[in-house]
Amino acid sequence: MKTGIHPDYAPVVFRDLASGATFLTRSTVSSQKTIEWEDGSTYPVIDVEISSESHPFYTGKQRILDSAGRVEKFNTRYKNFGK
């Protein structure tokens, strides 16, 4: 690999603004804001609007749209079509 062309891959904390959850992971993204982690070390923090802690798909609070009504409406409208 060439030296000097790859981004820095370092530990970063992602903070979910909706739920307040924090995740320590590694990333190439960086920030001027920092946070002190549970281990006493200071890491750059990236604020995200939504994560797996607050997204309805992952929390189980998703709404499932009822498409059966639309299918039934379509079938009743076109049941005699082509006969």
From Swiss-Prot:
Query: Which keywords label this protein?
Result: Ribonucleoprotein, Ribosomal protein
The record's annotation in Gene3D superfamilies points to:
Ribosomal protein L31
The keyword Ribosomal protein appears for this protein: yes
Instruction: Write out the GO cellular component annotations.
Output: ribonucleoprotein complex; ribosome
Q: Which GO terms describe its biological process?
A: translation
The GO terms describing molecular function are: structural constituent of ribosome
Q: Which InterPro entries match?
A: Ribosomal_bL28/bL31-like_sf, Ribosomal_bL31, Ribosomal_bL31_B, Ribosomal_bL31_sf
The family database entries (Pfam families) matched by this protein are listed as: Ribosomal_L31
List the PANTHER family hit by this protein, alphabetically.
50S RIBOSOMAL PROTEIN L31, CHLOROPLASTIC, LARGE RIBOSOMAL SUBUNIT PROTEIN BL31C
- Family (UniProt): Belongs to the bacterial ribosomal protein bL31 family. Type B subfamily.
Which NCBIfam families does UniProt cross-reference here?
L31 (TIGR00105), PRK01678.1 (NF002462)
Q: How does it assemble?
A: Part of the 50S ribosomal subunit.
Q: What is this protein called?
A: Large ribosomal subunit protein bL31B
Provide the species name. Leifsonia xyli subsp. xyli (strain CTCB07)
